[in-house]
Amino acid sequence: MKRADDFQQRRAHLANLSDEELQTRFWEMAEKIVDPLLDLGKKNTTPSIERSVLLRMGFSSLEAKAIVDKTMDRGLMGKGAGHIVYKIAKEKNISVREAGLALSEGKYWDDAIQIFKGGVK
Protein backbone atom coordinates (compact mmCIF):
# COMPACT_ATOMS: atom_id res chain seq x y z
CA MET A 1 0.00 0.00 0.00
CA LYS A 2 1.45 3.33 -1.04
CA ARG A 3 0.63 6.49 0.85
CA ALA A 4 -0.97 9.23 -1.20
CA ASP A 5 1.24 12.29 -1.52
CA ASP A 6 -0.64 15.04 0.30
CA PHE A 7 2.34 17.20 1.21
CA GLN A 8 1.05 20.24 -0.68
CA GLN A 9 -2.28 20.08 1.17
CA ARG A 10 -0.63 19.67 4.57
CA ARG A 11 1.74 22.60 4.03
CA ALA A 12 -0.87 24.99 2.62
CA HIS A 13 -1.23 26.89 5.91
CA LEU A 14 2.56 27.40 6.03
CA ALA A 15 3.20 28.21 2.36
CA ASN A 16 2.96 31.99 2.68
CA LEU A 17 5.16 32.30 5.78
CA SER A 18 8.68 33.72 5.57
CA ASP A 19 11.65 31.86 7.00
CA GLU A 20 11.56 34.13 10.04
CA GLU A 21 7.85 33.50 10.56
CA LEU A 22 8.39 29.74 10.18
CA GLN A 23 11.16 29.84 12.75
CA THR A 24 8.97 31.81 15.16
CA ARG A 25 6.12 29.34 14.65
CA PHE A 26 8.48 26.41 15.22
CA TRP A 27 9.69 27.78 18.56
CA GLU A 28 6.15 28.61 19.67
CA MET A 29 5.07 25.04 18.96
CA ALA A 30 8.20 23.63 20.61
CA GLU A 31 7.40 25.64 23.76
CA LYS A 32 3.85 24.24 23.77
CA ILE A 33 5.32 20.75 23.81
CA VAL A 34 8.13 21.35 26.31
CA ASP A 35 6.42 23.68 28.82
CA PRO A 36 4.18 20.97 30.33
CA LEU A 37 7.24 18.72 30.74
CA LEU A 38 9.18 21.47 32.49
CA ASP A 39 6.17 22.18 34.67
CA LEU A 40 5.97 18.51 35.68
CA GLY A 41 9.66 18.53 36.52
CA LYS A 42 9.29 21.61 38.69
CA LYS A 43 6.20 20.40 40.56
CA ASN A 44 6.88 16.68 40.92
CA THR A 45 9.85 14.96 42.44
CA THR A 46 10.62 11.81 44.37
CA PRO A 47 13.20 10.85 46.97
CA SER A 48 14.94 8.79 44.30
CA ILE A 49 15.23 11.77 41.95
CA GLU A 50 16.52 14.00 44.75
CA ARG A 51 19.12 11.41 45.80
CA SER A 52 20.18 11.13 42.17
CA VAL A 53 20.68 14.90 41.96
CA LEU A 54 22.76 14.87 45.14
CA LEU A 55 24.86 11.97 43.86
CA ARG A 56 25.68 14.06 40.80
CA MET A 57 26.64 16.91 43.11
CA GLY A 58 29.30 14.64 44.62
CA PHE A 59 27.63 13.23 47.71
CA SER A 60 27.74 9.55 48.61
CA SER A 61 24.53 7.56 48.65
CA LEU A 62 24.47 7.57 52.46
CA GLU A 63 25.00 11.34 52.59
CA ALA A 64 22.35 11.88 49.92
CA LYS A 65 19.86 9.68 51.78
CA ALA A 66 20.39 11.64 55.00
CA ILE A 67 19.89 14.98 53.23
CA VAL A 68 16.75 13.79 51.42
CA ASP A 69 15.27 12.28 54.59
CA LYS A 70 15.78 15.55 56.46
CA THR A 71 14.38 17.49 53.50
CA MET A 72 11.21 15.38 53.60
CA ASP A 73 10.94 15.69 57.40
CA ARG A 74 10.81 19.47 57.04
CA GLY A 75 8.35 19.53 54.15
CA LEU A 76 10.85 21.05 51.73
CA MET A 77 10.84 18.27 49.15
CA GLY A 78 9.16 20.47 46.56
CA LYS A 79 12.08 22.87 46.73
CA GLY A 80 14.59 20.19 45.71
CA ALA A 81 17.27 18.80 48.00
CA GLY A 82 20.07 19.90 45.68
CA HIS A 83 18.58 23.39 45.51
CA ILE A 84 18.50 23.56 49.31
CA VAL A 85 22.15 22.49 49.53
CA TYR A 86 23.12 25.09 46.93
CA LYS A 87 21.18 27.91 48.63
CA ILE A 88 22.69 27.12 52.03
CA ALA A 89 26.18 27.06 50.49
CA LYS A 90 25.58 30.52 49.00
CA GLU A 91 23.96 31.88 52.16
CA LYS A 92 26.77 30.64 54.43
CA ASN A 93 29.55 31.31 51.89
CA ILE A 94 30.77 27.71 52.13
CA SER A 95 31.27 24.98 49.55
CA VAL A 96 28.38 22.88 48.32
CA ARG A 97 30.06 19.85 49.88
CA GLU A 98 30.34 21.53 53.29
CA ALA A 99 26.73 22.69 53.12
CA GLY A 100 25.46 19.22 52.23
CA LEU A 101 27.45 17.52 54.97
CA ALA A 102 26.22 20.06 57.51
CA LEU A 103 22.62 19.51 56.40
CA SER A 104 23.06 15.74 56.62
CA GLU A 105 24.19 16.27 60.23
CA GLY A 106 21.10 18.35 61.00
CA LYS A 107 22.69 21.82 60.83
CA TYR A 108 21.32 24.87 58.97
CA TRP A 109 17.78 23.51 58.59
CA ASP A 110 16.29 26.54 60.34
CA ASP A 111 18.10 28.67 57.76
CA ALA A 112 16.76 26.51 54.92
CA ILE A 113 13.21 26.86 56.20
CA GLN A 114 13.70 30.63 56.44
CA ILE A 115 15.19 30.87 52.93
CA PHE A 116 12.35 28.88 51.41
CA LYS A 117 9.65 30.50 53.56
CA GLY A 118 8.80 27.29 55.37
CA GLY A 119 7.82 23.88 54.16
CA VAL A 120 4.62 21.88 54.09
CA LYS A 121 3.29 21.35 57.60
Swiss-Prot record:
Spell out the reaction equation it catalyses.
D-ornithine = (2R,4S)-2,4-diaminopentanoate
Coiled-coil ranges per the record? Answer: none
Provide this UniProt record's keywords sorted from A to Z.
Answer: Isomerase
Q: Give the signal peptide, or none.
A: none
- Name the Enzyme Commission number(s) assigned to this protein: 5.4.3.5
Q: How is its activity regulated?
A: Increased activity in the presence of dithiothreitol (DTT) in vitro. Inhibited by 1 mM potassium phosphate and potassium chloride. Inhibited by L-alpha-ornithine, D,L-alpha-lysine, L-beta-lysine (50%-60%), L-alpha-lysine (26%) and by delta-amino-n-valeric acid to a lesser extent. Significant decrease in activity is observed in the presence of 0.2 mM p-chloromercuribenzoate, N-ethylmaleimide and also by 2 mM iodoacetate to a lesser extent but not inhibited by arsenite.
Say which domain of life the source belongs to: Bacteria
* Disulfide links within the chain: none
Gene3D superfamilies attached here? Answer: 6.10.250.2220, Ornithine 4,5 aminomutase S component, alpha subunit-like (1.10.8.1000)
Regarding pH, the record states: Optimum pH is 9.0 or between 8.5-8.7 (with Tris-HCl buffer). Half-maximal activity is observed at pH 7.4 and 9.7.
GO molecular function ontology, one term from the record: D-ornithine 4,5-aminomutase activity
Q: How does activity depend on temperature?
A: Optimum temperature is 37 degrees Celsius for native enzyme. Displays half-maximal activity at 23 degrees Celsius and 49 degrees Celsius. Rapidly inactivated at temperatures above 45 degrees Celsius. Loses more than 35% and 30% of its activity when stored at -20 degrees Celsius for 1 month and at 4 degrees Celsius for 48 hours, respectively.
Manganese listed as a keyword:
no
Kindly state the subunit structure of this protein. Answer: Heterotetramer of 2 alpha (OraS) and 2 beta (OraE) subunits.
Entry function: The role of OraS remains obscure; however, it seems to be required for a correct folding of the OraE subunit. The complex is active only on D-ornithine and 2,4-diaminopentanoic acid and not active on L-ornithine, L-beta-lysine, L-alpha-lysine or D-alpha-lysine.
Its recorded name reads D-ornithine 4,5-aminomutase subunit alpha
